[in-house]
């Protein structure tokens, strides 16, 4: 929460996407994200979305869905964070301000399919957090790397969480993000690095890259 808040402040982002490996972990963290989002949304009204195939079976989430005819900006609601039915469709899931969902919601940003630009639009204004990034197979890693490159091109801060990510894999992911930045901002290629790269070979734990 501290890292995401700092990134939101620095990059002036308007929300968070939190990608987790399973529906169970999403459900377990949903209430915590809702509580945190409410604490940082005192002066604004924001939408939250639980994005996975079993979201309709989460009782807490369904109890927070406001009625379709409720006009949030005209009628007083109990919380500064709400679940609006407009965001319930798969196409518009990532357009909510705060989204917690299975990691495939993020990986599909690199899958050519209908309405994929709505997914890019939803992610482009957020801080992206991906948990357990060491646990994916070779197939998922290809989509992870490509999605990270897309986010770098949009200037989206990406936070990857892992307790056991190998040094070599960390370098690959960081270099892929750098590639996305340089592809969209060619002048960066000519700039000299201003920060020491010693951390690239650092194996201490915990490590913030």
Model segments located where?
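Single conserved hydrophobic/aromatic residue that forms the stacking wall/gate
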Residues: 1-7, 11
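Conserved Walker A/P-loop ATP-binding site and its immediately adjacent core
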Residues: 15-36, 52-55, 169
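A substrate-engagement module of RecA-like helicase motors
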Residues: 31-98, 103-107
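Conserved helicase/translocase P-loop NTPase motor core
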Residues: 91-122, 126, 143
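Catalytic acidic motif of RecA-like/P-loop NTPases
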Residues: 104-107, 133-137, 163
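SF2 helicase catalytic motif II
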Residues: 119-144, 149
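Conserved helicase ATPase motor motifs in RecA-like P-loop NTPase domains
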Residues: 148-178
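Interdomain hinge/linker at the junction between the two RecA-like core domains of SF2 helicases
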Residues: 172-209
């Amino acid at each position: 929460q501290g890292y995401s808040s700092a990134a939101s402040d620095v990059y002036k982002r308007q929300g968070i996407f939190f990608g987790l490996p399973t529906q169970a972990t999403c459900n377990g963290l949903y209430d915590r994200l809702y509580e945190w989002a409410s604490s940082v949304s005192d002066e604004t009204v924001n939408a939250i979305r639980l994005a996975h195939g079993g979201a309709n079976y989460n009782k807490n989430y369904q109890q927070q869905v406001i009625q379709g005819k409720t006009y949030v900006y005209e009628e007083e609601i109990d919380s500064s964070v709400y679940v609006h039915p407009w965001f319930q469709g798969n196409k518009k899931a990532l357009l909510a301000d705060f989204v917690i969902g299975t990691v495939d919601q993020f990986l599909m940003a690199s899958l050519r399919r209908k309405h994929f630009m709505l997914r890019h639009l939803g992610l482009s204004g957020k801080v992206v957090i991906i948990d357990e990034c060491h646990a994916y197979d070779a197939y998922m890693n290809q989509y992870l790397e490509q999605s990270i490159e897309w986010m770098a091109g949009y200037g989206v801060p990406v936070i990857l969480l892992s307790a056991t990510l190998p040094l070599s894999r960390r370098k690959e992911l960081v270099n892929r993000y750098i590639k996305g930045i340089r592809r969209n901002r060619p002048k960066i290629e000519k700039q000299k690095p201003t920060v020491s790269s010693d951390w690239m070979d650092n194996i201490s734990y915990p490590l913030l890259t």
